Amino acid sequence: MNFATLRSDLLSKPGASEDFPFDVQTLVIKVGGKMFALLGINDDPLRINLKCDPLKAELLREPYPAVQPGYHMNKRHWKTVVLDGSIAEAEIRSMIDESYELVVKGLPKSRRPG
């Protein structure tokens, strides 16, 4: 999965928008003004930070060494996924969906997309 495909997939989520609030190297994808994904645009291999259920994140770290505690984030509620080819794209998309859904669920109804 490359940067362009990943960015396109993230922005296809209802209400998703992109921003660079930290620096020009870190793309932040938000829904309802809240972050659900962060990408280092020059990372090699590509890395993505995603919101996660704390228990599920721990379970994913065992079979997938590429799933790590969230870099520069709350390590309990965020994970960093190194996109080095060791995790199937379907699993990565599932992690993205979970991150998006967790953030949307936490939004006030007035800020939830459609």
What residue spans do the PLM features occupy?
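Charge-dense, helix-prone N-terminal extensions
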Residues: M1-G114
